[in-house]
Every structure is written in structure tokens, then in C-alpha cells.
Amino acid sequence: MIKKSLLCTALSVTAFSGWAQDTRPDTLVVTANRFQQPRSAVLAPITVVTRQDIDRWQSTSVNDVLRRLPGVDIAQYGGMGQNSSISIRGTNASHVLVLIDGVRLNLAGVSGAADLSQFPVSLVQRIEYIRGPRSAVYGSDAIGGVVNIITTREKPGTELTAGVGSNGYQNYDVSTQQQLGENTRVTLMGDYAYTKGFDVVAYGSTGSQAQPDKDGFLSKTLYGALEHNFSDTWSGFVRGYGYDNRTNYDSYYSPGSPLLDTRKLYSQSWDAGLRFNGELIQSQLVSSYSHSKDYNYDPDYGRYDSSATLDEMKQYNVQWSNSIVVGHGNVGAGVDWQKQTTEPGTGYVTDGYDQRNTGLYLTGLQQLGDFTFEGAARSDDNSEFGRHGTWQTSAGWEFIEGYRFIASYGTSYKAPNLGQLHGYYGNSNLDPEQSKQWEGAFEGLTAGVNWRVSGYRNDIDDMIDYDPHTEKYFNEGKVRIKGVEATANFDTGPLAHTLSYDMVDSRNAITDKPLARRSKQQVKYQLDWQVYDFDWGLTYHYLGTRYDTDYVTYQPVKMGGVSLWDLAVSYPITSQLTVRGKIANRFDKDYETVYGYATAGREYTLSGSYTF
């Protein structure tokens, strides 16, 4: 394990003194610059979600976790397991880089966007979520932000969990972490989740035949990890996980042809790494392999019938990252190598293709008096597009003790994926998307309130979109995004408050039309308190107006705003047994995040966990 105390001492001078007045310990994060540092030293806005948060919210999906976070806007084609997209600060879903333990999530299919409706929430032990450009650190895709899902469990022992809920929801989970001798730790986990679901199509067209069925979801997950400390400075790990998902959905139907209304996703990932953690130097070498097979088929014909579709992707990664404490800060450097291969038929590609990318990056953080400076530069060599460079820089000025002003600028890009280039809907003439972003922010600690207010602008050239008329991907030109984000957290006696407000104006800079499925405004509020050992949580989410397209008439539609309330409670019956209950969408609001696709309405869940 990293010598956290030594690293904190070396970097503590960069930590913002206003946060030091808070009684809560400063969390260490790794996602911002690829080296471990106190969260308060990071100039970009970053949010950390722990497993304790997820259990307290009683979230049954990763999307339910992420929707609570600042800047996140989720559009989903129905309920649990249905296709979804994540927008951060008004950008496309393909502009969100999703990492699993620091490694890019393998994405099968044409869109190039991470669909986290399929990723098991049972695997999530921690999330580090950073907003703003990060291509200078991670390469392609990191235009809107980075979501790093960490699966490493820090809690020893064994836990058994079972839950039931509305729409036939069931969940059974067992996990254990055991010490094998003084220097070896093993972790195992298995999870089963199922829901009968509901009919996801609210209105619109599914062809010549209605499909008034329930669209359910089934997921089975296995996870294993082995960690070993060879000495005080050297350690290694081997880790693997896989999940097998089945999703039923409503699809377009015409008489005499198969109805492709079932999705079957197989995914497996393996990685191994070696770490060196000295007093001033850290180094890590990680290699990984992932393989996903995504079928869409008619159950009457089977997934191997000629009518079925298959998206199959293999991904190979090697990462070597290094950092050294220098002066009042840190310098990091490393290299990434990635190879992605598609099998014939993937994304309607008739032949198999592969794409290779090698990236070199340099990062740095330094404090000079009341000023903190952060920078990064990266060069990517892509087999499809050649060499591409990105950079970013930030500066923070603590002009009064406890109050800081931050200014930042960064460039980023998104390369088209293999399906967008070579698939049936592809366009081999696509150019990479280019982004330039500016942000200014004030933050501080006032009367016990930790707050941050920021304004940002993001200009994206050659943004890739899909044209339903031509059935092709194309570069639609220039997109302009402007926004304001405000966050705060504070305690009033036994009550803990977390609040965020987002106002985003994202539109095509040429036509001045707003981009689809982005809320103009969002308000998110979390209230937590404890009374007689009962832990209560109240969640409020205002989802503002947004625009979409009616794909029957191809006319734009405006969807009104909605206020959603959740209530959760847990009670420890003993020191080992805890029961939990939740009401989601307490007032049973009828709303949509994708036009024509219903949401679940009011739902109840009840669960219990036993630890030993």
C-alpha cells in the first residue's frame, strides 16, 4: 500500500487552508493527475463517493448513484438495465471517460459512449468523479469529465446482503475479504440482481404491433482479487471480474420479421499490476485485458440466428505511471498503450478492425506562496489519425485565508471509434472532435459552509452526431456550452446537508438550437440525520426542462421539469445485522428523460445485510 502519511506530509503544503478548518479528514484521490494527493489540493472540481454513501442511498444501479452528483444529467430508455447515456456539463455521453480501477472501460458498439446501466453497482466500492477537461492526462474522450469506478474493497470480513422491491426486484450478494498471512489479502464477491421491470414505451411507435410487455433485467456478477506486499515498498495485485446481463426492451417490429427485443451482454476483465511506493517516488505498471460480447436478438430464434446482431470488442492496455515529490508539489509522467479490436459484424462492420493508441503524458503540481499551479501535457499517436497533442493548466490564488480563486484552461479531444468509422452507419471521413474549455471559480469555508461557485465555457468543433435521416454519423460543426455550477455542504446540529445547482446552456453554435436531452437547470439536495440509531436520508432532485425529438414525426419536443423526492432509512438491529428501506419517487411523478420512454414511478425496496 502507498505510504499515505509520507505523501500527505509532502503535499500538505498545497492543500487549501480553508478546507483544513473542516473537522472531516482530507480524502486522498488519484484520478485528477494520476498520483495520490489530498482532494483539497486538486484545483479541478472533484467529488468522491464511498461504499458507505451508496449503502446509505440504497442505490440499485450505478446511474442512481451518479444522478446525485453535480453536473451529471442522465437520460435512460426506461428502467433498470435499459440503455442510458450520461452527460457531464452539457457534453455528449461519448465525452465522459469512464475508468474501472484507472483503466478505460471496454466499450462495444457504435456510439462510443459508456452505458453504465449494465455495470453492476455491487462492484463499486468508490467513485472519484472529476469535472472538466482531462485529455491532457488520459487522452481521448475526457472532454466533459472523468468517472473512475474503483472496485478495491478496504473493509475486511464477510457480508451477506439480500433485498426485494417493487416490479419484482430481487438482489442477493455475498462478499468476503480475508487476510492470508501478514502480507496477502484475497477478495471474492458474487451478486445476483433481477427485476421484472415494466413496459418502458410510454407512447410513440414500435412499428405495426404494440408490445405491452414488461421489460425486465437480470444480472449475475463474479469478482476476485489477490493483493500481496513483497516488502514495505513493493506490492502487486491480480484482479478479475465478469458479468452476464440480460435485458428485455421494446423494439421496432414489422410482420414477417424477427423481433429483436432482447439484449445479452457478456463482459470480462482481467488486470495485474506491480507498484513501488517509496518516500518520494511512486511507480506503477499495470496490464489489462477485457472482452465483451453484446447480442441483440429475438428469443424465438436465438442469439446465433442470422437476424441477431453482435457487438464484440477486445481491449488490451498497458500503463506505466510514475510520480516524484519535487519542492512543494509533485511531477508525474507515464506512457499508455491501448489496442482495441472488433470482430466481423460488430456495429454492422463486415470485417474486423483494430485501433492502436500510444500516449505520453507529463503532469505537475506546485505551490509558490499563496499560489498553486497545476499543469499537464500529452501526446497521443493513433493508428487511425496520427499524432494529437493536448494540454491544460490551472492556477489557484488563496487571496484571503480560507478563500481561493481558481482559473483554468484546457484542450481535449474525442476520436471516432471503429464503429463510427467503419460500421454500416459509419463515416470514414469523420474528424476527431476538438474542445477548448475555460473555467473560473471561487471557493471557501464560510461559517461552517464549504462552498464553490464556478462558471465555464466549452467550445467543441466537429462534434460527432447521428443523423436519423441519412442514417450516418457526421461532424455537425461547432457546439457552444456555457454553464454555472454551485456546490455546498454543511452541518446544522445533527443534520448534514449537501447541495448543488447547475445551469447549462448547450447548443449548436451554428443553428442556435439546444442540444437534446440536457436539462437547462438542475437542483440536487441531500439531507442526512440520525435519530435513536435510525439513519435517515432525504434526497431532492429538480430536473429542469429539456428538448428531445419525436422519432415518429421527427419534430422537436419540449419536456417539462419535475421535482423528485426519495426517502431512505436504515437501522442496526445488532452490531452485525442492518435493515434498510427506501421509497424512490415518493410522490409518484410521471416524467421522462428520453421522449416516449416511461420511468418507473414510485418504487419501494427493503434489504438487510449481515456482516461477520
Curated annotation (Swiss-Prot):
A GO MF term: metal ion binding
Domain annotation TBDR beta-barrel: ranges: 155-612
Organism: Citrobacter freundii
Binding-site positions, cyanocob(III)alamin: 85, 92, 110-111, 309, 517, 551
Designated name of the protein: Vitamin B12 transporter BtuB
Signal peptide: 1-20
Occurrences of domain TBDR plug (ranges): 38-152
UniProt entry tagged with the keyword Hydrolase: no
Motif TonB box, residue range(s) on this chain: 26-33
Binding site for Ca(2+) 1: 199, 211, 213, 215, 250
Keyword Signal: yes
Motif TonB C-terminal box location, chain numbering: 595-612
Cross-referenced PANTHER family: COLICIN I RECEPTOR-RELATED, TONB-DEPENDENT OUTER MEMBRANE RECEPTOR
Its job: Involved in the active translocation of vitamin B12 (cyanocobalamin) across the outer membrane to the periplasmic space. It derives its energy for transport by interacting with the trans-periplasmic membrane protein TonB.
Top-level taxonomic group: Bacteria
Segments traversing the membrane: 158-165, 169-178, 184-195, 217-227, 232-248, 263-277, 279-296, 309-325, 328-337, 353-369, 371-381, 385-400, 403-417, 434-443, 449-458, 473-490, 494-509, 517-529, 535-550, 556-570, 583-594, 600-612
Binding site for Ca(2+) 2: 213, 215, 249-250, 261
Location(s) in or outside the cell: Cell outer membrane
One GO term (biological process): monoatomic ion transport
Family: Belongs to the TonB-dependent receptor family. BtuB (TC 1.B.14.3.1) subfamily.
